[in-house]
């Protein structure tokens, strides 16, 4: 079974499962997905999140995926050894219907922390009505995923507010996302001057601009299939202050096409934003860190070298 089909099965399975919802205190562990022992989910909102959307049931976790997220959290993974001072907020993919929170989340954090980079895994809200990728409905399905973007903005501010406590450099905090999470990377990279919620505490005085951005097989950036015209919701917000960006996609990606990365690449180049694009002939979609004989499986090493060239970690 292909990786994309496998994740689709995970999402459908999770949607069919039911669980008992327990009322807990704000700082208690939420029901649904749980991180590995030794790590704690931190609610990113002190109370109810803004723009709450209805979901069909309680948060449900199955086979490495999670659905019906209404209570967003961040989980911090710190390096055991050498610390570079850099941090990456990770956005798993899942079409804004669910989150591949292990495949494109905890496994990614294991890799990053092994390189001395602090990883902050964001369990952002899904589904994010009206932005739910349930079909290939471009060009109509180009809305900004407001609840998810609110969560991303808030998390970047929280990470900066804890920089001293977590031994981070406030100027080395970036984002990495896959598929829908890759689209969220482009949103937070271009909407950092657009506040989408009312400030709730002192952390919201911090900047939500990423210092660097990494989008792996991002989706819904091109206006149409076989077109490199960029989604105007993103294009209209690109400026010279958009952070340096790393893009990667395969030509045989039949879920989110190569034009998604190409269109964003061209938009960034037009604004003189430093950008690096890696395009491969084969590899499909949703491959994460899975090893293969294909060249694309070496993408983590490319990211590490790129982070060194832009001064985020030691080359």
Q: Can you annotate each of these PLM segments?
A:
Residues 101-120:
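Short amphipathic alpha-helix adjacent to the substrate-entry channel of hydrolases
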Residues 147-234, 240:
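Primarily recognizes the serine-hydrolase "nucleophile elbow" in alpha/beta-hydrolase
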Residues 95-104, 123-147, 191-192, 197, ...:
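Cap/lid segment of the alpha/beta-hydrolase catalytic domain
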Residues 262-315:
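C-terminal catalytic histidine-bearing segment of alpha/beta-hydrolase fold enzymes
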Residues 247-249:
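Short beta-strand/loop motif that positions the catalytic acidic residue
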Residues 85-93:
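Short beta-strand element of the alpha/beta-hydrolase
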Residues 254-260:
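Conserved alpha/beta-hydrolase "acid-adjacent" motif
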